[in-house]
Amino acid sequence: MLEIPPKRSPRPLLKASFTARVLRHDTDLALTTLFFEDGELRVPLIDFPIESGVRVRIDARDVSIALSRPMDVSITNRLPGQIAELEFLTPPYVRATFDLGKTRIHSLVTRESVERLALVPGLKAWAMIKAVAIAGGALSRDRLPEPRTWPSDRRTSPVKP
């Protein structure tokens, strides 16, 4: 049984924000791939040039946790990492901080899920990201994460005006 710490409101802890770079556009599937320091995210096609920077926001309510690699799911964005922290909020909610490497995102789960999955800091798990928001316009290319290689497959193309 979990010891329940004092209550806190979940509102100020619901979003993570970081910079990503447009890696490629897949016009056939209407998806854009974004690169950030700890992986890639696929989002609906955005009208930004390849290599441009964007600000990404991920709401904790859009992040689920899996203990094993999720294979047969419709969620496209699945990233490995580990639970860094659990913060008990107003019942029944718990904010799970998920460490992807250099990037941290949050998942808003219930206490029941924490108990059922036996979530504890340090536990390796998968973040399943259901939605990603792009905030504002394209950013300067200075200080953007640099992918190891730029892809050149047939689906890589600039967004058509």
Please give the residue ranges for each predicted region.
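Well-ordered beta-strand positions
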Residues: 23-26, 87, 99
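Short aromatic-glycine-enriched beta-strand elements
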Residues: 28-33, 90-97
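Internal alpha/beta loop-helix hairpins
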Residues: 1-40, 66
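Glycine/charge-rich catalytic "coupling/switch" loops of P-loop NTPases
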Residues: 7, 11-13, 40-87, 104-161
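Short solvent-exposed strand/turn elements
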Residues: 34-42, 96-105
